UniProtKB/Swiss-Prot annotation:
Catalyzes the 2'-O-methylation at nucleotide C2498 in 23S rRNA. GO terms for molecular function: S-adenosylmethionine-dependent methyltransferase activity. Belongs to the class I-like SAM-binding methyltransferase superfamily. RNA methyltransferase RlmE family. RlmM subfamily. It comes from Pseudomonas putida (strain ATCC 47054 / DSM 6125 / CFBP 8728 / NCIMB 11950 / KT2440). The gene is rlmM. Monomer. This is Ribosomal RNA large subunit methyltransferase M. It catalyses: cytidine(2498) in 23S rRNA + S-adenosyl-L-methionine = 2'-O-methylcytidine(2498) in 23S rRNA + S-adenosyl-L-homocysteine + H(+).
Length: 354
């Protein structure tokens, strides 16, 4: 139970290691991080008993940037037959669980195991319920079984309220056929990640206004229109006719980094390919000058020290807003639909309600 196991995007294992090591050092949890390149996972092995539990207790999962999912536990080697009996024996010292997720890594090997997991889950679930190890109670810990192979599994536990929203941190979003580009799924995932579902009507209402900077062809604009917002799309490139036909979109041929609205808007979204430091300046202007209430903005990460750069820019934003004496909540996550980038959500907390 003394290893913290984390899923991530393949190629970002080093970022997960850097991030969790920084948090562990700050909290005084001794150990070391490791992650095989392109494995889609990383671990923090704690040197002292209870270290992994303390990390998960002190940290909020939604404040971590690069991990998609986490669990504390250890590896179990399984026989070719009667895997369930071995797992039941291993779980004897674990708490009673309120839910069960079988997970695989986001790799070719992991995808090959997904069929096995679907078939294995039904008899395993029945056996756990019969043994009194699994009950229907969302308040109890979640059992997370990450299969590395059919014979090797990481048996982990996590709080259902302090871990990923979906198995492996991968949302099952359906691409809408009428959307102009697949980038639309990035913004839809951001809504789920950063805004509690019960607040959607209030914060993503059809009486709101939005701006999409670098909008062409309209993947992110589509999500705003889908919520019924009046949208100003800023881009020198063309917009999808289907969006223009809704009557909810005004397309202005302008530079997304220099254009500003005459009146404040509710939402600003931006997925422009640009150096992250320049995009950060854009965020500081829009939130700092009250041009929008909330924003979802992607920071592109072409550099090598990706976690260090993201951390530097987030700290810079926080210091900028503090110096201006304005209250802004800042969240950042590498979403499943992100590539070499992270998604930031910002919200002014000191503006009067609409």
């Amino acid at each position: 139970m003394n290893t913290l196991f984390m899923h991530c995007r393949p190629g970002f294992e080093g970022e997960v290691c850097a991030e969790i090591s920084e948090h562990a050092a700050r909290l005084g949890v001794a150990g070391y991080a490791k992650g095989k390149p392109q494995s889609a996972s990383a671990e923090f092995v704690c040197s002292e008993e209870g270290g992994a539990e303390r990390l998960m207790g002190e940290l909020r999962f939604n404040q971590l940037i690069f991990p998609r999912q986490w669990a504390r536990g250890g590896y179990v080697e399984l026989p070719e037959r009667d895997r369930i009996s071995v797992l039941l024996a291993q779980l004897a010292d674990f708490p009673v669980f309120g839910s069960l997720w079988l997970e695989v890594l986001d790799s070719n090997e992991g995808k090959e195991l997904s069929t096995f997991c679907r078939k294995f889950e039904v008899p395993l679930r029945k056996a756990l319920e019969k043994a009194g190890r699994l009950v229907d109670d969302p308040g109890r810990p979640r059992l997370l079984l990450t299969f590395i192979s059919g014979r090797r599994v990481f048996v982990g536990v996590a709080s259902a309220s302090n871990s990923a929203l979906w198995p492996m941190g991968i949302p099952r979003l359906k691409f809408p056929r009428e959307a102009p580009s697949r980038s639309t799924l990035k913004l839809e995932e951001a809504w789920h990640q950063f805004i509690p579902r019960e607040q959607w009507e209030q914060r993503l209402g059809d009486d709101m206004t939005g701006v999409d900077l670098g909008a062409s062809p309209g993947g992110w604009t589509y999500q705003l229109v889908r919520r019924g917002m009046l949208v100003t799309a800023i881009d020198n490139g063309p917009m999808a006719e289907s969006l223009m036909d809704t009557g909810l979109v005004q397309h202005l041929m302008a530079d997304g980094f220099t254009w500003q609205p005459k009146q404040p808007v509710d939402w600003m979204v931006c997925d422009i390919v640009e150096k992250p430091a320049r995009t950060t300046s854009l965020i500081e202007t829009w939130l700092g000058e009250g041009l929008c209430r909330e924003a979802v903005v992607n920071l592109k990460l072409p550099m090598k020290q990706r976690y260090a750069e993201v951390r530097r820019l987030l700290d810079r934003m926080e210091a900028t807003f503090k110096a201006r004496k304005i209250r802004v909540s800042i969240a950042c996550k590498q979403l499943y639909h992100d590539r070499e980038e992270v998604t930031c959500h910002l919200r002014r907390l000191d503006l009067k309600p609409r």
